[in-house]
Amino acid sequence: MNIENKEITSSWFTNLRDLLCKEFEKIEEEYAQTKGLKPAKFVRSSWQRNGGGGGVMSLMKGAVFEKVGVNISTVFGKISPEFRNEIPGAELDGKFFATGISLVAHLKSPLIPAMHFNTRYIETSKSWFGGGGDLTPFYPEKNETVKFHAAFKEVCDKYDSSYYPKFKKQCDEYFYLKHRKEPRGVGGIFYDYLNNGNFEQDFAFTQDVGKTLLSVYPEIVRSKLFLPWTAEQKEYQLIRRGRYVEFNLLYDRGTKFGLMTDGNVEAILMSLPPEVKFN
């Protein structure tokens, strides 16, 4: 396993975490100032994994972000024998290293889309990058969806013109609730097992995906920050959040990987909404 690659990827995810938290706190502050409220701040808690490594959870519950979590983790060790065949390159000895960042934002306003983003670097006897970002609006708007996709298409095209159509398709297929026969949201990009034989290029792409999210999502949030909403719209948001819960518990690879590698359960389930209704 390449020690330098581990260090620079882990360092980047920590840096991106700091940038995201700072930007989201800034949005909370902008809103709080106009409403005479005390702005919310992220609360951090660290955890250690028994088999090796650990992570830091950053959680904020505010007036804009009902619940937003930004987690970073770097874990290593051996995967249990019963799960080794599910992780490429871990079949023989089970050794693995994984570092990454994950973000899930659930907004108080039903007019502002929920956001999911993660990027990661994993080593077994093989190595690869994965990640992506997807938007889940409760009241979709075409212009907003187009803008979101255009931002990720631009970063994809910078590296390979085949990336965006491929990663968009993978996102559409991945974030699909088979039992309901419906998509979770309006998509985005999703990639996994990315290894083109050029670590620097794959890493640069993964960094740019993070920078794109840092730019496009706060802009979407700010555009609807002060729009009024109704009790009926809030009720609909709570019901639709149930789809988020269903996907994360039934299909999400990150949830499964975290549980298979004895990760922190609270951090793994951070993606679940703070309030939800099932009718």
From Swiss-Prot:
SUPFAM superfamilies: Coproporphyrinogen III oxidase. Pathway: Porphyrin-containing compound metabolism; protoporphyrin-IX biosynthesis; protoporphyrinogen-IX from coproporphyrinogen-III (O2 route): step 1/1. Keywords: Cytoplasm, Heme biosynthesis, Metal-binding, Oxidoreductase, Porphyrin biosynthesis. Residues 244-279 are annotated as: Important for dimerization. The active site is at H116 (proton donor). It comes from the Bacteria. Coiled coil: none annotated. PROSITE patterns: COPROGEN_OXIDASE (PS01021). The record marks H179 as: Important for dimerization. One of its GO terms (biological process) is protoporphyrinogen IX biosynthetic process. InterPro entries: Coprogen_oxidase_aer, Coprogen_oxidase_aer_sf, Coprogen_oxidase_CS. It holds the Pfam family Coprogen_oxidas. Disulfide bonds: none annotated. It is found in: Cytoplasm. It catalyses: coproporphyrinogen III + O2 + 2 H(+) = protoporphyrinogen IX + 2 CO2 + 2 H2O. One of its GO terms (molecular function) is protein homodimerization activity. Gene3D superfamilies: Coproporphyrinogen III oxidase, aerobic (3.40.1500.10). Its cofactor is a divalent metal cation. A divalent metal cation binds at H106, H116, H149, H179. The keyword Metal-binding applies. Substrate binds at S102, N118, T119, R120. Homodimer. Involved in the heme biosynthesis. Catalyzes the aerobic oxidative decarboxylation of propionate groups of rings A and B of coproporphyrinogen-III to yield the vinyl groups in protoporphyrinogen-IX. Belongs to the aerobic coproporphyrinogen-III oxidase family. This is Oxygen-dependent coproporphyrinogen-III oxidase. It comes from Rickettsia rickettsii (strain Sheila Smith). The lineage of its organism: Bacteria, Pseudomonadati, Pseudomonadota, Alphaproteobacteria, Rickettsiales.
